[in-house]
């Protein structure tokens, strides 16, 4: 599997904060959220004989076109609110983003476009049903570290009108040292580079 693109380390030409009403409106973003649960399921068929069960998450909201219409809507300004029951907990956040020709004063055509999210404590980020990753290589969509941002290149040269379906799987952790706190977004933004 090829190395996923890495976001630039230089300052962006323009940033839009998705945690504001105005910022989310630029992309037509409506955030939905739902708690995810660990559920017991049968072990894989080639597991060692002593393993009869294992665990999966429910729902699998990373799928492109996943129906989140019954999920509660979360105002952009409420993305930073504490969610989950604390300890080991999981939450899905979903939104569709449409790239405008003009993003709050910035002409977007041809710009490198990066989605940055920072979830307390960890996140996995799916875009259009894919989580770009490669074993043994930096993979910005996967867990980056304790309270570290995920910075995914959405497109090297974006075209106005392009749509991105984003699903963020938020994880409260460390899992083996269950914290007495909750999960929330520290930041969510779109960065443009020239």
Which sequence ranges carry the predicted segments?
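Residues that flank catalytic or metal-binding motifs in active/ligand-binding sites
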Residues: 67, 91-93, 121, 148
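Aromatic-lined ligand-binding clefts that engage carbohydrates, nucleic acids, or primary amines
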Residues: 62, 71, 89, 97, ...
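Flexible loop/turn segments at secondary-structure boundaries
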Residues: 122-124, 133, 173-176
């Amino acid at each position: 599997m090829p190395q996923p693109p890495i976001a630039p380390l230089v300052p962006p030409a323009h940033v839009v904060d998705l945690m504001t009403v105005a910022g989310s409106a630029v992309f037509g973003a409506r955030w939905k959220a739902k708690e995810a649960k660990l559920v017991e399921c049968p072990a894989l068929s080639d597991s060692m004989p002593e393993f009869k069960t294992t665990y999966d998450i429910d729902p699998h909201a990373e799928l492109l076109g996943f129906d989140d219409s019954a999920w509660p809507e979360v105002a952009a300004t409420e993305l930073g609110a504490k969610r989950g029951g604390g300890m080991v907990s999981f939450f899905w956040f979903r939104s569709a983003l449409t790239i405008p020709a003009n993003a709050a004063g910035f002409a977007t055509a041809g710009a490198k476009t990066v989605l940055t999210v920072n979830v307390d404590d960890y996140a996995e980020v799916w875009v259009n049903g894919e989580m770009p990753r490669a074993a043994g290589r930096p993979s910005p969509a996967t867990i980056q570290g304790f309270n570290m941002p995920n910075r995914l290149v959405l497109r090297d040269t974006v075209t106005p009108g392009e749509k991105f379906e984003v699903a963020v799987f938020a994880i409260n952790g460390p899992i083996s040292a269950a914290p007495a706190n909750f999960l929330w977004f520290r930041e969510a933004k779109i960065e443009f580079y020239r």
